[in-house]
């Protein structure tokens, strides 16, 4: 029908083509053309006219890292009536896509003879409340000014990054600084907390164990010595490198460690406050924790009222 509409006013050898002649050549009834021309736009046509702009804004606000599934979830959370297949189709038409993770680079070679903390996790990286299980790891990022070493501490319940540090070395102090940030953000005393890591020397040090003991936490280390023994921390490291270090907004190398540190601050805030995490139901970590504490506050108030009513 678009062909007829586009060509009906053309003139060939002094004669205007018109609808009737084109329909005769195409073996289409003129009434079919007029019916299609006068028909109201379909719901799909109308939505396809509006949704691309909305999707692009959501993708851009998500640091241009969301793929089909996460952008679809973000669109639904934003109140858009859209399906996953439609999201994929519109993303293709817009020429946008999610970031792709690269193969992990091994940074720690465990010493099987070294004394290490026991494995208290057994590859179960989940918990029923915040501050029951933290996981931590060190990774590195090359810059023009030298190698930057990055330590993250993640709460297994909500996937919140509770502490982090970017430094020019991978000494124990780098890990201790991340613990200090976590202690400042989560509380000075957290009895029953386990802090899981790989078998790097920083995490086997006496000072590391003593610092955790100060907040009531106990260190633990996986026993096998492969990425699955610290899978959650490895996942966050992978997200960090795909979304920030090699992300769409920074295609080239990082100039200085300070530049990377400032950018990491922004990424951690977005990771905690806005990024959707599939493992926790496609909500941001902050939203999950807020709901947890609100529910427990309500349960506590109900229990107190029940107790008072029985007196």
Feature-to-residue mapping (PLM):
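Charged DNA-binding/catalytic regions of mobile-element recombinases
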Residues: 1-311
């Amino acid at each position: 029908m678009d062909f007829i509409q586009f060509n009906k006013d053309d003139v060939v050898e002094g004669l205007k083509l018109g609808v009737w002649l084109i329909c005769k050549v195409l073996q289409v009834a003129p009434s079919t053309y007029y019916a299609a021309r006068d028909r109201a736009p379909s719901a799909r046509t109308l939505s396809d006219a509006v949704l691309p702009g909305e999707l692009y804004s959501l993708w851009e606000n998500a640091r241009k890292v969301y793929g089909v599934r996460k952008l679809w979830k973000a669109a639904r959370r934003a109140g858009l009536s859209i399906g996953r297949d439609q999201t994929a189709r519109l993303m293709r038409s817009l020429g946008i896509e999610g970031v792709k993770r690269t193969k992990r680079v091994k940074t720690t070679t465990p010493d099987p003879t070294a004394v290490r903390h026991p494995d208290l996790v057994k590859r179960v990286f989940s918990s029923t409340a915040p501050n029951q299980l933290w996981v931590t790891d060190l990774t590195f990022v090359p810059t023009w000014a030298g190698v930057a070493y990055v330590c993250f501490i993640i709460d297994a319940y909500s996937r919140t990054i509770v502490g982090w540090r970017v430094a020019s070395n991978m000494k124990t102090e780098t890990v201790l600084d991340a613990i200090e940030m976590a202690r400042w953000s989560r509380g000075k005393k957290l009895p029953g907390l386990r802090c899981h890591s790989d078998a790097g020397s920083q995490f086997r040090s006496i000072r590391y164990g003593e610092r955790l003991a100060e907040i009531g936490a106990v260190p633990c280390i996986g026993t096998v010595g492969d990425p699955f023994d610290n899978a959650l921390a490895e996942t966050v490291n992978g997200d960090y490198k795909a979304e920030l270090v090699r992300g769409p907004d920074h295609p080239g190398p990082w100039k200085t460690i300070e530049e990377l540190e400032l950018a990491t601050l922004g990424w951690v805030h977005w990771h905690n406050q806005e990024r959707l995490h599939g493992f926790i139901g496609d909500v941001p970590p902050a939203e999950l924790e807020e709901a947890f504490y609100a529910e427990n506050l309500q349960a506590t108030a109900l229990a107190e009222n029940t107790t008072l009513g029985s007196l």
